[in-house]
């Protein structure tokens, strides 16, 4: 139990501009529909220490007259992130009513792909090429569409062959303008291997550097299976493709809309879900992971133009909380939720280069006087290792039902370390703990046994050396 340890310090937050490299990002989506004020969020996002910000390109907001592109609105966003040391990556989307009459009725032209007429296809090609050219040197990663396997984002009905051809062509346009740009495809929200394989059969993999996927779940252990399956499938078509976790998250209260809306979320549970999912993503070996999202905002995926009530579908996924005005725009002070501080701690701990590693560590399943029960076995706990040039981290937690069950128990660990120093870090509040001598048995030859090592339903880190 954590109360047996001695607190000796606190994780110091790092600003994004002070972090050279990181695998952790935050969603900054939906500004194509102007749903929140980015000016009130930039500094708070940078203070969290994320290194990636996902944007949506907003074709309909940018090209209101055929062939005329007004990039001013998104220029400001991209420049603000670049100035703060954050890499913007852009999801190219959605439709445009000047090319597609069906999009005239759809708020934000969401889910109206330009694939049916030569004029639509040419309009999209010209827009993509203009966008990539305009942002060359500032934007390096481009994602093709968003959740095309969902009815809300491919409104005439999801079709994997259509998506594959669309992605293939868009990837070709991107590479023609900027051969160094990275192209991300898939962007899928389901676990439909058949859909993804059918899309790959069109040849889209020839133009992809990455496949992204969205994993909204209260069970973060599902991430490992998803990453393994999608990676192996992608490698069949192109062995160079890697994975990006493009959206994950949970809500901070009940009564919301969007993914996982029906569950009994609280701000505390949201913070737990962020911690467990983010570190699971890091364990899975994805290129980077992006949490959805920076801000409480309307979902705005199924709105009708002229009918405000149709898109007042509030989602409470943000690490920043907000109020809403009569038009559904996020207003107020944009306060920091507990999940924000947990994200900030994780960003600080995992700043810089690190790699996955195995740890010479075992759990001893013995009777515990503290719990009057047997200690947890390693097979009952999620575990993973990381190392850098200065130390190692062993991350672990008990994967209880995050919505119903909190855990504060103990186990016994035996491990080898080449370092003289080891501590425990709680990512939830950033506390750094020393292990009291009475809990340590020194076995010699670099081997230690820790009795009554705390285990929680949120990640604890056994840190050896100077990883942090």
Language-model-derived ranges and their functions:
Residues 2-130, 143:
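N-terminal substrate-binding region of glycoside hydrolase catalytic domains
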Residues 22-28, 53-55, 88-92, 140-144, ...:
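Hydrophobic faces of well-ordered beta-strands that scaffold small-molecule active sites
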Residues 35, 103-233, 254-274, 407:
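Active-site cleft segment of glycoside hydrolase catalytic domains centered on the general acid/base Glu
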Residues 212-259, 277, 287, 291, ...:
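Glycoside hydrolase catalytic-domain groove-lining segments
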Residues 258-370:
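Aromatic/acidic polysaccharide-binding cleft in carbohydrate-active enzymes
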Residues 363-420, 459-461:
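Carbohydrate-binding surface patches
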Residues 414-433:
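Solvent-exposed beta-hairpin/edge-strand motifs
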Residues 436-468:
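C-terminal beta-strand-rich structural cap/linker in extracellular carbohydrate-active enzymes
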């Amino acid at each position: 139990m954590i109360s047996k340890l001695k607190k000796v310090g606190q994780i110091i937050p790092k600003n994004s501009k002070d972090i050279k490299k990181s695998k952790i990002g935050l969603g900054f989506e939906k500004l194509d529909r102007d749903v929140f004020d980015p000016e009130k969020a930039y500094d708070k996002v940078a203070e969290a220490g994320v290194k990636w910000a996902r944007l949506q390109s907003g074709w309909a907001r940018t090209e209101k007259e055929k062939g005329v592109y007004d990039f001013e609105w998104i220029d400001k966003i991209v420049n603000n992130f670049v100035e703060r040391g954050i890499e913007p990556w852009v999801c190219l989307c959605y439709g445009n009513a000047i090319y597609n009459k069906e999009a005239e009725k759809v708020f934000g032209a969401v889910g109206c792909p330009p694939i049916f007429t030569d004029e639509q296809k040419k309009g999209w090609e010209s827009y993509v090429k203009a966008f990539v050219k305009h942002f060359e040197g500032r934007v390096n990663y481009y994602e093709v569409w968003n959740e095309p396997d969902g009815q809300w984002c491919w409104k005439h009905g999801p079709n994997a062959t259509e998506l594959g051809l669309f992605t293939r062509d868009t990837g070709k346009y991107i590479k023609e303008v900027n051969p160094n740009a990275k192209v991300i495809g898939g962007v899928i929200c389901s676990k439909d291997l058949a859909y993804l394989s059918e899309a790959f059969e069109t040849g889209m993999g020839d133009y992809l550097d990455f496949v992204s996927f969205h994993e909204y779940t209260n069970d973060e252990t599902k991430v490992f299976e998803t990453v393994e399956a999608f990676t192996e499938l992608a490698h069949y078509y192109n062995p160079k493709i890697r994975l990006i976790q493009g959206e994950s998250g949970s809500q901070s209260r009940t009564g919301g809309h969007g993914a996982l809306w029906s569950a009994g979320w609280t701000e505390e549970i949201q913070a737990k879900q962020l911690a467990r999912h983010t570190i699971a993503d890091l364990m899975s070996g994805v290129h980077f992971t992006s949490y959805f999202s920076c801000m409480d905002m309307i979902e705005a995926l199924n709105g009708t133009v002229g009918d405000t009530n149709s898109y007042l579908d509030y989602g409470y996924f943000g690490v920043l909380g907000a109020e809403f005005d009569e038009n559904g725009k996020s207003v107020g002070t944009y306060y920091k939720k507990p999940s924000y501080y947990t994200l900030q701690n994780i960003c600080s701990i995992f700043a810089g280069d690190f790699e996955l590693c195995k740890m010479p560590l075992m759990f001893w399943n013995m009777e515990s006087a503290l719990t009057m029960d047997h200690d947890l076995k390693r097979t009952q706990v999620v575990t993973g290792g990381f190392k850098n040039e200065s130390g190692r981290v062993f991350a672990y937690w008990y994967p209880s039902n995050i919505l119903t069950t909190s855990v504060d128990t103990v186990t016994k660990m035996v491990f080898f370390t080449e370092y003289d120093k080891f501590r425990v870090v709680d990512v939830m509040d950033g506390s750094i703990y020393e292990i009291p001598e009475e809990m340590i048995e020194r076995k010699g030859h670099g081997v230690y046994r820790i009795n009554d090592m705390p285990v929680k339903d949120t990640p604890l880190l056994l840190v050896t050396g100077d990883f942090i």
